[in-house]
């Protein structure tokens, strides 16, 4: 399944080919190197990098030009759902279950090469028999954490959905509820959050339980089997919530689902080390839900009115560079919006009646 790289060095006693040389700017450059350079140029022409993507001003122009008109295209939605079903089978593979994971199975991590885990009785006992999410879902809200949500007054509209997905333990305190709502059926948690904010639950179990209580009776969705270092923190989350008798249920992301979703979007032109959590959730929602509206998916520093906005609605902490391809992801989602597959909320849901927001 996993290929291995072979060394390029020649064997002793075997004559090595002479690489032809060509003159360039007074020096000599291997012909192979020039061919490689041409290949790289062609690659960036065919698969342009971020510098060739539309900037925020161009995207604002496109969004404003498209206007508020939007209609759900059920035919396009059904076709896209079939694509996701064929590649990734989200209803069956979205989370780890006893039904999709055999005892003794060698489970390959999706975020690391050559790393796997053998599923034993202890690990398998943490999985539900089948997915506990009752399918199909009718209306879903997927809430990203983009700064465009600030002062959007979209909270009420978000909460009207039957199923609300949120990403990476976002704050839902009173100062934000007008904009992002409070309802949550599923919230994702990256193991890195458990490490940075809760010291891997070695000393901060109670503070973690208090933090997730805001999500009430929801599913806590964790990529426990994406990297080896993320497995133990994810299992600690499971045991912590179980020990405290909370209302949350931990679901572990199936690495086969995450891997296949990554391949799917790569085939569509998203070239990144790893997809954002938001795009994983949108992909799941488009398969599990009949109607999908997404909020807070805007990777630019200005809103539609040309005003500077923070990276998140709650802070301005920037992500690590080189991991995600947020503009490329946005363009894919914008195309789905224009096609009527999903609705992307980019403007205020309710217009402000005063300069000061009521609370």
From Swiss-Prot:
Pathway: Protein modification; protein glycosylation; Lipid metabolism; sphingolipid metabolism. Its main location: Golgi. It is found in: Golgi apparatus membrane. Keywords: Developmental protein, Disulfide bond, Glycoprotein, Glycosyltransferase, Golgi apparatus, Lipid biosynthesis, Lipid metabolism, Membrane, Signal-anchor, Sphingolipid metabolism, Transferase, Transmembrane, Transmembrane helix. Its EC number is 2.4.3.8. Residues 1-28 are cytoplasmic. Pfam families: Glyco_transf_29. One of its GO terms (cellular component) is Golgi apparatus. The keyword Transmembrane applies. It catalyses: an N-acetyl-alpha-neuraminyl-(2->3)-beta-D-galactosyl derivative + CMP-N-acetyl-beta-neuraminate = an N-acetyl-alpha-neuraminyl-(2->8)-N-acetyl-alpha-neuraminyl-(2->3)-beta-D-galactosyl derivative + CMP + H(+); a ganglioside GM3 (d18:1(4E)) + CMP-N-acetyl-beta-neuraminate = a ganglioside GD3 (d18:1(4E)) + CMP + H(+); a ganglioside GD3 (d18:1(4E)) + CMP-N-acetyl-beta-neuraminate = a ganglioside GT3 (d18:1(4E)) + CMP + H(+); a ganglioside GD1a (d18:1(4E)) + CMP-N-acetyl-beta-neuraminate = a ganglioside GT1a (d18:1(4E)) + CMP + H(+). InterPro entries: Glyco_trans_29, Glycosyltr_29_Sialyltrsf, GT29-like_sf, Sialyl_trans. One of its GO terms (biological process) is N-glycan processing. Glycans are attached at residues 73, 121, 247. Residues 50-359 are lumenal. It comes from the Eukaryota. GO terms for molecular function: alpha-N-acetylneuraminate alpha-2,8-sialyltransferase activity. The chain crosses the membrane at residues 29-49. Expressed in the dorsal blastopore lip and in the presumptive neuroectoderm in stage 11 embryos. During gastrulation, strongly expressed in the involuting mesoderm. At stages 13 and 16, expressed in the neural plate and neural fold, paraxial mesoderm and notochord. At stages 19 and 22 (neural tube and early tailbud), strongly expressed in the neural tube and notochord. At the tadpole stage, expressed in the head region, branchial arches and otic and optic primordia. Also localized in the notochord and weakly expressed in the somites. In adults, expressed in the brain and ovary. It is a single-pass type II membrane protein. It is an enzyme of class 2 (transferase). CMP-N-acetyl-beta-neuraminate binds at residues 145, 168, 276-278, 298, 312. Disulfide bonds join 140-289, 154-349. Belongs to the glycosyltransferase 29 family. Catalyzes the addition of sialic acid in alpha 2,8-linkage to the sialic acid moiety of the ganglioside GM3 to form ganglioside GD3; gangliosides are a subfamily of complex glycosphingolipds that contain one or more residues of sialic acid. Glycosphingolipids are required for convergence extension movements during early development. Can catalyze the addition of a second alpha-2,8- sialic acid to GD3 to form GT3. Can use GM1b, GD1a and GT1b as acceptor substrates to synthesize GD1c, GT1a and GQ1b respectively. This is Alpha-N-acetylneuraminide alpha-2,8-sialyltransferase. The lineage of its organism: Eukaryota, Metazoa, Chordata, Craniata, Vertebrata. The gene is st8sia1.
């Amino acid at each position: 399944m996993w290929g291995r790289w072979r060394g390029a060095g020649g064997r002793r006693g075997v004559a090595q080919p002479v690489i032809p040389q060509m003159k360039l700017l007074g020096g000599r450059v291997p012909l192979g190197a020039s061919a490689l350079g041409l290949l790289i140029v062609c690659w960036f022409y065919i698969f342009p990098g971020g510098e060739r993507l539309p900037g925020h001003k161009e995207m604002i122009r496109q969004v404003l030009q498209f206007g508020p008109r939007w209609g759900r295209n059920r035919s396009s939605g059904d076709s896209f759902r079939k694509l996701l079903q064929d590649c990734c089978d989200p209803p069956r593979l979205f989370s780890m279950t006893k039904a999709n994971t055999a005892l003794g199975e060698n489970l390959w991590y999706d975020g690391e090469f050559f790393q796997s885990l053998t599923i034993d009785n202890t690990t398998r006992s943490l999985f539900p028999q089948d997915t506990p999410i009752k399918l199909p879902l009718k209306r879903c809200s997927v809430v990203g954490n983009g700064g465009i949500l600030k002062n959007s007054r979209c909270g009420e509209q978000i909460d009207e959905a039957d199923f609300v997905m949120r990403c990476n333990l976002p704050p839902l305190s009173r100062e934000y509820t007008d904009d992002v709502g409070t309802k949550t059926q599923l919230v994702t948690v990256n193991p890195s959050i458990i490490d940075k904010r809760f010291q891997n639950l070695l000393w901060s179990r109670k503070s973690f339980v208090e933090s997730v209580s805001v999500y009430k009776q929801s599913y806590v969705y964790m990529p426990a089997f994406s990297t080896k270092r993320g497995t133990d923190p994810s299992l600690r989350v499971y045991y912590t919530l179980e020990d405290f008798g909370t209302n949350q249920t931990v679901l572990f992301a199936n690495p086969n689902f995450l891997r296949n979703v990554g391949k799917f979007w790569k085939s569509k032109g998203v070239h990144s080390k790893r997809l954002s959590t938001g795009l994983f959730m949108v992909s799941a929602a488009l398969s599990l839900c009949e109607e999908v509206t997404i909020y807070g998916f805007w990777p630019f520093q200005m809103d539609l009115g040309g005003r500077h906005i923070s990276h998140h609605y709650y802070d301005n902490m920037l992500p690590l560079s080189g991991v995600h391809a947020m503009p490329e992801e946005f363009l894919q989602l914008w195309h789905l919006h224009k096609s009527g597959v999903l609705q992307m909320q980019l403007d205020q849901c309710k217009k402000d009646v005063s300069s000061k927001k009521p609370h």
